[in-house]
Amino acid sequence: MADMLTIAGKTFSSRLFIGTGKFASPEIMRDVLQACKSQMVTVALRRVNLADPEDDIMSQIDTGETNFLPNTSGARNAEEAIRLAELARAGSGTNWVKIEVVPDPRTLLPDPIETLKATEELVKRGFIVLPYMNVDPILALRLQDVGAAAVMPLAAPIGTNLGITNRLQLEMIIEQARVPVVIDAGLGAPSHAALAMELGADAVLVNTAIAVADKPVAMAEAFAMATIAGRAAYLAGLGSQCPVASASSPVSGNITVDLDFLD
C-alpha cells in the first residue's frame, strides 16, 4: 500500500511542500513544481492577485495537480492574519491557510501568542489551519488543542539554510503530535530534509535552498529524492546509536595464524 500523507482528510503522495517566495521567475517556479512533483505549494497573499486568472504566479500553478496553500506572510498580529485568510477564501474559494504571524522583521520568528489566537479563531470560522511556529513542544500541543490540521515548526530561522538547529525539541514535537508535523524554514540542503524525515516528520517545506541554487530544478529533484529516502529510512527503523564500538563480525572462533616462519 502506498505511503500517503493525510491532512484534514486530503491525501498527498509527495511529502515535499514548496514555497514560492524567492524564485527568479514564475516560469522557474513552474519547472521546479513539475520536476519535484510537489502537491502542496504555499503562496504569500500579498504577492498575488487572486482575482486575476492571468496572475504571473497563479497562472503557473496547476491547481488540478497541486494544492494551493495561501499564507499570511506580512501579518504582524492575529487580526491581520485573520483578515488575510478571509481575503484568500473570498478570492480563491479555498479554506486552507498557512498562518504566519511575524512581528519582527529582523528575526522573522513567528509570534507564538498571536499565532495561537489566529489559529483558534480561524478554526472556528471553518478554516483548515496550518500554523508556522517556533520549535516549542508546548505551543505545538496548544495549537493541536484548538484545532490546527498540522503544525509547522521551523528547522532554523527562515532563509538561513542552517538545517535543524534544535533537534531535541523538534523530536519532542514529533513524538507527541496528534496531527502531521511539517518542518518549515531553514532547511538548506537535501541532507537536512532527509534528516527531518528520518526523525519522523510527516513532510518538509522548502523554498530558499531550491530558489537560490545554481540549478533550481536539479536541486528540487534532489530534495524530492532526499525526502523519499528519509521517509523510507524512518519506516524501515533506524538502528540505535551507541557511544562505544560494537563488532559487526564474529569475535569468537578466530583463526590463529603461525607467523614463526617470518623469524
From Swiss-Prot:
GO CC annotation: cytoplasm
Pathway info: Cofactor biosynthesis; thiamine diphosphate biosynthesis
Known EC number: 2.8.1.10
Entry keyword Oxidoreductase: no
Gene3D superfamilies, per the entry: Aldolase class I
Subcellular location: Cytoplasm
List of catalytic residues: K98
Keyword Transferase part of the UniProt annotation: yes
Catalytic activity: [ThiS sulfur-carrier protein]-C-terminal-Gly-aminoethanethioate + 2-iminoacetate + 1-deoxy-D-xylulose 5-phosphate = [ThiS sulfur-carrier protein]-C-terminal Gly-Gly + 2-[(2R,5Z)-2-carboxy-4-methylthiazol-5(2H)-ylidene]ethyl phosphate + 2 H2O + H(+)
GO BP field: thiamine diphosphate biosynthetic process
InterPro entries: Aldolase_TIM, Thiazole_synthase_ThiG, ThiG
Residues binding 1-deoxy-D-xylulose 5-phosphate, per UniProt: G159, A185, G186, N207, T208
Top-level enzyme category: transferase
One GO MF term: thiazole synthase activity
Quaternary organization: Homotetramer. Forms heterodimers with either ThiH or ThiS.
Chain's role: Catalyzes the rearrangement of 1-deoxy-D-xylulose 5-phosphate (DXP) to produce the thiazole phosphate moiety of thiamine. Sulfur is provided by the thiocarboxylate moiety of the carrier protein ThiS. In vitro, sulfur can be provided by H(2)S.
UniProt name for this protein: Thiazole synthase
